[in-house]
UniProtKB/Swiss-Prot annotation:
Pfam families assigned to the protein according to its UniProt record, in alphabetical order: CxxCxxCC
Superkingdom classification of source: Bacteria
Disulfide bonds: none
Annotated signal sequence range: none
Full protein name: UPF0260 protein NGR_c07710
NCBIfam families to which the protein is assigned, alphabetical: PRK05170.1-5, PRK05170.2-5
InterPro entries linked: Puta_zinc/iron-chelating_dom (IPR005358), UCP006173 (IPR008228)
Amino acid sequence: MGDMPFWKTKSLDEMTNAEWESLCDGCGLCCLNKLEDWDTGEIAWTSIRCTLLDGENCRCKDYDNRQATVPDCVQLTPKAVREISWLPPTCGYRLVAEGRDLYWWHPLVSGDPETVHAAGISVRGRTVAEDGIEIEDYEDYLVTWPLEVGLEPVE
């Protein structure tokens, strides 16, 4: 058991900060704007990314201070991961919370932060910045691919 990776031996609550942060695969999916139907609670995804998400490297441009710039940025915690229904099905936090293993393309498994992009999981090249887009126009950017990434094997 000593040679098993930490995500197979620890719960989210038991992880160090460094282990916790490394569970993020860098896909950027959680930083896409989502719309919620007030009647049904259904979540609809858009291709509109947060103003702080870099569309190419799929990382936050100001991670440490993100909530000062984007007050509604969701801070992932073990409790939040267990409660948030919209985390992508491939999310490392979600997978570990559900007792499942990380995918082959996750940087912790592959050893390479580029595999999440090469496997077609990330938002790289598929988004537009939210800056200048009116909220009433968000429906023009509805997409389903965030819930479909990772379902088909990459050729």
